[in-house]
Amino acid sequence: MYYGEIKNCDIANGEGVRVTLFVSGCTNRCKNCFQPQTWAFDYGQPFTAETEEALLQMLAPAYINGLTLLGGEPFEPENQRGLLPFLRLVRERLPGKTIWAFTGFTWEHLHTDGSHPRCEVTDELLSLVDVLVDGRFVEELHDISLRFRGSSNQRIIDVPRTLSSGGITLWEDQ
């Protein structure tokens, strides 16, 4: 897996102050994507054990609320496989931090057997995520007044509550 950028102290992509990882590789190719350079799976730098340790150190301070995954597309199968061991580490070493993920795929698509991007690690990866912003960016539905999303078709899903209830539960700003 490759990544295009890491932002420390990001306040735009999730609740509170966050560390944001922009993974590389995306087959969605949304019109007017704000990161089209990350569509290439080999854009940026390889995601290594050293990268993981650097991210864990950035996440450690008490003022950092958590980690946000963007792209590219974190839920491309190869990215899911690359992210899963790292998210396990985050949960093990920093259990109080929240994990947000943005995806151009819908919750329903991620749960449809046989569909791209569902793979053998999708369920476990989702179980490690607190909040999922799902759905493609749609230029015609772009609305700058929306918090944490670019277009009105996108949802901010409370993953633990959704998994426990069996129905989509939207995240509510605390």
Where are the language model's segments positioned?
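Short, conserved loop/helix-junction motifs that constitute active-site signature segments
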Residues: E124-S127, G150
